[in-house]
Amino acid sequence: MSHIDGDDHMTKDLIDSLESKDNDLSLVTSNTQIPDVEVANLTHDADEINQLFDTATNNVLPESNKKDKPIDTQDLHEDDPKAVPKTTSNGESTSNSNSVSPKLLPNDGKSTPKIQKELRRKSTFVPVTSNSKSLEPSEDDNNNNNNNSRISAYARLDFENFTFFVQTLQVVLGRKSNDETLQQNVDVHLSSKKAISRRHAKIFYNFGTQRFEISILGRNGAFVDNVFVEKGLTIPLTDGNKIQIGDIPFKFVLPSNEPNEENNNQDSSEKQFNPSDAINLRSNLYSKSSSPQSSPKRKPQPSKKVKKEPVSASNTSKDIKPTPPVPTTAISPTASISTSTNAATAATATTPATTTAARKNSINRRNSLLKIRRLSNARRKSLAANDEINELLKDLGVTSIDEINEEDSELLDAQIQSLLDEDNENLGGIEDSLMKLAEFNESAIDDDDDDEEGNENSQADLDRLEKTMEHDAIDDEIKAIDSNLTLLDDEISKLTPLINDTNQGLLEEKETKKKQLEEEKRKKQLQQLQHKNSLAKFPRRSAPLMGKPASIQPPASSSIYSRINGLDKIGKTVSPRPPPPKLIAPVLRVTAEPSAIRSRPPLRAITVSDSSYIATFSYPKTIEEPSKYPKPKVKKEHHKKHSKKVYSLDEIPEPYRSKPNISFQIMITNVLKTEAARNGLIINEITEAIKEVYPYYKYCTDGWQFSINHCIKFTKIYKRLQKRGSEWLYAMDELYINERENIRIKQREIAKAKAKAEALRQEEIRQRQRLEAQKSLPHNIVGRNFASPYANTRVPPNQYNQFSQSSSSSSSSATTTTNGQYGSTTMVGGTSPQAGSIRAQLAAVRGNGNTPATTSTTPSLPAMNDPKTKKSLEYLQKELFTLYKARKLTYDTQTATSLITKAVATTIAQVNSIGAKAGAGDNALVFLVERAPEKVSKILDIALTKSIKEHEGIASKSPSQPATPGMRPEQLTTTSQSAATPTTTPQISNLQSLPVKPPISTPLPQVPQQQVSGVNIPGPIATPNIGVTSGVGNLGTTSIGTPTPTQIQSPATSVIPAMQSPQKPVSTPIPTSVPVPLPVPSAPLARPPSFGKPPGAGSSLSRPKAFGKPPGAGSSLSRPPTFLSNKPSYKRELEDDEEEGEQATNKIAKTE
């Protein structure tokens, strides 16, 4: 590296250069003596330095002195005292600064200083590949002040008032540290600002791409040609690139565009630096003195063999300078020798004249040999041969090859052969040589050779570099041919399907060109093999040659790196073969007696045969003839699942537009039960079969397949058989289906057995209840159809009939019996109930047209056909449904119907009772619905609550002997009242015509006060307990002629005297032996009076009429009503058996 600051560039009078320890600063000047200034007297004073610069400038620029123009002075270093050169007693200038620090002084808006411009113009920036001449020293040079200094460098960094010459393969720019141990990491100190990193950027030469590149290391990045480059990026550099790091701009200059004043009269222009031409730079580094211009005729050398003279050089970071009588004027690298630690300082030393002269002769002789060898190599080059030969001839000082002396050529050839023989003596492994070559490519210039043998080894490395570059050039040419062949193949493959008269000629032309390229490629490959064979095993070198290592990536096509990595140029893997290891087991000495030791075979070393390390390889064999044209590269298309077509409604056939009304499980079962699915089907096959069987799924959108998949995998009636590829085969699991069917059959049998046992248990309960009822009524032989308002009195039915129906007994007693409120509706002969019964009314409410026909016409029949009555019944039904829904009950339909029917019956009975009191007659329901609907709703609510409580078993239980309910007032009226309202009694009696089956004894709500023949009876009258077992059966399907006797409870009459509490009903049996007339009391009686005979009754009440007479045989009742107490036992058992059979059947049906 070279660092020139200010006017110091143009000084020809300075002998020693002011340079830092880590800087390859080289100032090559002529030997003009300056009588006024000496280097040893330099101090830190700025005035002395400026005076020195003025003196040097006056000697160099006489024209400027004539014009008396002031010359700008530049400071060499920054204010850091460590960066200022120190003067020692022996004239050795040292510096603690590791890096060159540009002093960026303000220029007051001016451009680059004139001194810098003059320096860059006068200092010939000579590329390494041209005009690198070694000037031999002569005695006349002491007085020669016209020789201009020359600086050889790879590139140059032009700062605003600072110039940096790049003379190594790698330059690091950044900010130096105050720590002396870290200062060798930075070559160019840009600034002390924190925006610049310690190692901010690195400029290096890339041998792979053969160009300079810059790699950004700082986190703040940099600008290259006003384009920001962030950290971690590496971009190529060309001549003239403007770089800015922080606020420090500079320009990168390459020698290709640098003007050369000395060669303006020559035709050839400067070429860009080629790394293979590093020989000139290396030879200049070894040249310690300038050499004169070579004459057109080269002088013959006195000896045939190169003399090996020791070179007196310092490895302790010092540059050796000749004595003042022999000044040094040479190319810049010869004035600066970099060590591996980059710690070179300027120093002066005196050596004997004889040693210096011998060393110069040896170096010149070696340089001449190298040039001739390069010339012989250049003759074999096919590309750029003329430029290379002209360059070599120029270095040799001749204009053509013919001017070279043949005798000298033979001599030189002999000397070259001796050098080659000397190289052959130091042959090494090719791997070591190649590794050393890589080290050489990645290192900077290093001059640590102290003898001639080291110099010759360095020349062998340079030769190896040259051959490597030629090898890489051939690789690049082969690559270019391959790319051209690829393009031709593509064009031919495109033209082949379009062959016609027009394209035939073009195709033939492409074929011809292709053959030529293939022939050229074979030649290049042959030449490459020759170069590979001639890549000799070069002598080893212990240290790198070129200073700092540069991070240079090897080219991808370089044969050197491929061979280092185990690959040859053909692409085959070359397996490393280490020497086979020898495993030697140590033999221990045995001290026991020989007789106690068994004979053992001698221990032998275990060796491994070499054949085990030979890597096997194989290549495919084919009998097919290679095609003439390359196969077009077929792109691998990934299988993409095409979406299903969406059918419109018009595209779907009419029968397949509606979804089948069956489940997926049934579909899958139908598919798997076919013969085709005997061995199992995969899921996709099942879905396809479903599409065929049910075409609706062929046209519908996707998504139902997931349900099929889930149903198959998680339903136990399907089982997996085996795998077909990666999918399972599914079939019906017959074992599981049979097992589940058996379980179902067993459950059904168990349910039937439980139902039968329950029926038997219910039968036992009913028999027990019947027995208890029979025991509680031993003397009630005659049916109780009349209730006396007094206790302990019984009135025969015929006597009651004479009082209640004296005017109409002859017409109605033959076909019906008026048993009061609780008379039975079933005759012995199976006659139907009256037309005005509650069953007929409920049938009308439900709209049932099959109302049972009546056997006789009664006065209440016209009331059922009245529209007002129907309207009232509809109102009751609607209101009752509203009340039932408001309770949010969860009973089944049969239970709900039973509850509603029971509530309707109770409501109608209560309404008729209230209407009778109010004198409404037959139209009591209609009257109350029209006049007081809120009372009807209240009665409905009470009746529904009662029905629900009875059903749930919450109602209170009555005593074991059922009490006789009290008669309603209309049943206890006098004969005159009965005649005045002839239809009231039948209407009231119809309320009890519904077949019911209540619990044993449960009283209903009582009517508060009732009048019997004008007498106020304060106690509540017990009403019948109406329990409806099935509303539907009782209303519409139960046989009217033969109702079930167990559904009717024997009612009891209960009359409450005035002195008793109205909430407690009193059960009193009706006497049968004292027939007395019914008086009309005027006030409550303390005791019941004795009844006399009723008028027209006869002497006394005898036993009832014969039971066997049919109805209508006599004027009185043919037989009393049949109750549970007086009904024959065999009939009750038969009817109970029929009812239990029906209930058992219903329970079994529910269970199933």
Curated annotation (Swiss-Prot):
Q: Which PANTHER family match?
A: DIADENOSINE 5',5'''-P1,P4-TETRAPHOSPHATE PHOSPHORYLASE, DIADENOSINE 5',5'''-P1,P4-TETRAPHOSPHATE PHOSPHORYLASE 2-RELATED
According to the entry, DNA is bound by residues in: 659-756
Quaternary structure? Interacts with IFH1 and TBF1.
Bias (Low complexity): 87-101, 328-358, 804-826, 851-863, 973-987
Q: Where is the composition biased (Basic residues)?
A: 296-307
Q: Identify the stretch(es) annotated as Disordered.
A: 55-147, 254-362, 514-557, 787-833, 846-867, 951-1010, 1057-1152
Positions in coiled-coil regions: 449-537, 734-777
Checking PROSITE patterns in the record gives:
FHA_DOMAIN, FORK_HEAD_3
Show the Pfam families listed in the entry.
FHA, Forkhead
Look up the record and give one Gene Ontology term from the biological process aspect: nucleotide biosynthetic process
Q: Which GO terms describe its cellular component?
A: nucleus
Question: Where does this protein reside within or beyond the cell?
Answer: Nucleus
* Protein task: In complex with IFH1, acts as a transcriptional regulator of rRNA and ribosomal protein genes. The FHL1-IFH1 complex is targeted to the ribosomal protein genes by the DNA-binding factor TBF1.
Q: Where is the composition biased (Polar residues)?
A: 126-135, 271-286, 1115-1128, 1143-1152
The record's listing under SMART domains reads: FH, FHA
Task: Name the UniProt key words of this record, in alphabetical order.
Answer: Coiled coil, DNA-binding, Nucleus, Transcription, Transcription regulation
Q: Which GO terms describe its molecular function?
A: bis(5'-nucleosyl)-tetraphosphatase activity; DNA-binding transcription factor activity; sulfate adenylyltransferase (ADP) activity; transcription cis-regulatory region binding
Q: Where is the composition biased (Pro residues)?
A: 996-1006, 1072-1082
- What's the protein called, per UniProt? Fork-head transcriptional regulator FHL1
Q: Where is the composition biased (Basic and acidic residues)?
A: 64-83
Tell me which residues make up the FHA domain. Answer: 171-229
Signal sequence span per UniProt?
A: none
